[in-house]
């Protein structure tokens, strides 16, 4: 899980999801998981 100021899709499988006010990127590739912080 990477914590970044700006989260971006890194591939076409990435999905941007907002959970409890936190923007996250979910993907089939675990290296692409991100959270806005």
Swiss-Prot record:
- SUPFAM superfamilies the UniProt entry points to: Ribosomal protein L36
- What's in the GO CC field? cytoplasm; ribonucleoprotein complex; ribosome
Looking up Pfam families in the UniProt record yields: Ribosomal_L36
Single GO molecular-function term?
structural constituent of ribosome
GO biological process terms on file: translation
Q: What are the UniProt keywords, alphabetically?
A: Ribonucleoprotein, Ribosomal protein
Which InterPro entries does the record match to this protein? Ribosomal_bL36, Ribosomal_bL36_sp
Query: In which family does this protein belong, per the annotation?
Result: Belongs to the bacterial ribosomal protein bL36 family.
| Name the UniProt record assigns to this protein | Large ribosomal subunit protein bL36
What's the gene?
rpmJ
């Amino acid at each position: 899980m990477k914590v970044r100021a700006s989260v971006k899709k890194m591939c076409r499988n990435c999905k941007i999801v907002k959970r409890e006010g936190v923007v996250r990127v979910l993907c089939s590739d675990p290296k692409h998981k991100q959270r806005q912080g």
